[in-house]
């Protein structure tokens, strides 16, 4: 019989959550690919759809007012699915060459995941990367001390975030149910939506996140006042997306899980 009154599994995102501080790899590759095509987007525009399957991300970038206008000005017509496919092929090839370099665990990840496992929690993961991309990420992350018990990519389920199907596949593989005993942890709006659409708990991370949009060097050089302002803005976006909790860094996750377990116990007691 499944345990229903405590968290059984944590499902992490990858880039910006457990590896690749600031989710720099996809952001920099999108910038490079679009610049080569003559389309110049801001970092904020590039990062906004982050967490989606990468071909869907390209469509979102082309659909921005800036992307649409620049494409028409440069090519004299609106973009097509053929254009999306060409951009995606370039993106995939470019990312494949560099993604292993960006697969270093974010500070605090290795120790925190070890602590969670010692508490008996299973560690799942979902990502906007394809299986082929993850073949470059997994060995490097493992070499540096981070592994998930299962890794689910959009090409496996045929659907990406914010749909819940990758998270459901994690649950199926790890034999964990109901969804209310799962916590989704991520660094983008679609991570939060994935968890809520699955009926799980959703937790947003600030430090190292795509939503905060800072490299580690930028984070460390920023004034405390400006950093706090940016964190507050990112936290509001998480909460607007339905986050149950927002934490400063992954080191705060064990305490967040304890808080969720407390809420679950209170709810069960109230129902008795």
Report residues per predicted region.
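N-terminal helical cap/lid subdomain that shapes the substrate entry/recognition surface
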Residues: 4-110, 114-119, 135
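Ser/Thr-centric signal marking residues that sit
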Residues: 17, 127, 207
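Asp-based, Mg2+/Mn2+-dependent phosphohydrolase catalytic module
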Residues: 1-8, 110, 114-115, 130-272
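Structural motif
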Residues: 49, 126-128
């Amino acid at each position: 019989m499944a345990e229903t009154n405590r968290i059984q599994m944590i499902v992490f995102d990858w880039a910006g959550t457990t590896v690749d501080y600031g989710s720099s790899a996809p952001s920099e590759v999108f910038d490079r690919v679009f610049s080569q095509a003559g389309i110049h987007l801001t970092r904020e525009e590039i990062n906004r759809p982050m967490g989606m399957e990468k071909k869907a991300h390209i469509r979102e970038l082309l659909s921005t007012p800036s992307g649409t206008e620049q494409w028409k000005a440069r090519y004299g017509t609106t973009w097509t699915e053929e254009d999306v496919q060409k951009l995606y092929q370039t993106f995939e090839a470019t990312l494949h060459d560099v993604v292993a370099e960006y697969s270093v665990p974010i500070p605090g990840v290795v120790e925190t995941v070890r602590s969670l496992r010692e508490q008996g929690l299973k560690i799942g993961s979902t990502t906007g990367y394809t299986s082929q991309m993850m073949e470059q990420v997994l060995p490097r992350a493992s070499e540096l001390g981070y592994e998930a018990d299962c890794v689910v990519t959009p090409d496996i389920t045929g659907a990406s975030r914010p749909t819940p199907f990758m998270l459901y596949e994690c649950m199926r593989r790890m034999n964990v149910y109901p969804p209310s005993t799962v916590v989704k942890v991520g660094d983008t709006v679609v991570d939060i939506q994935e968890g809520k659409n699955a009926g799980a708990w959703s937790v947003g991370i600030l430090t190292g996140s795509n939503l905060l949009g800072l490299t580690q060097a930028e984070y460390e050089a920023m004034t405390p006042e400006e950093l706090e302002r940016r964190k507050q803005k990112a936290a509001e976006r998480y909460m607007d997306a339905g986050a149950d909790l927002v934490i400063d860094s992954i080191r705060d996750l064990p305490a967040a899980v304890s808080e969720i377990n407390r809420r679950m116990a209170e709810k069960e007691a109230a129902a008795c």
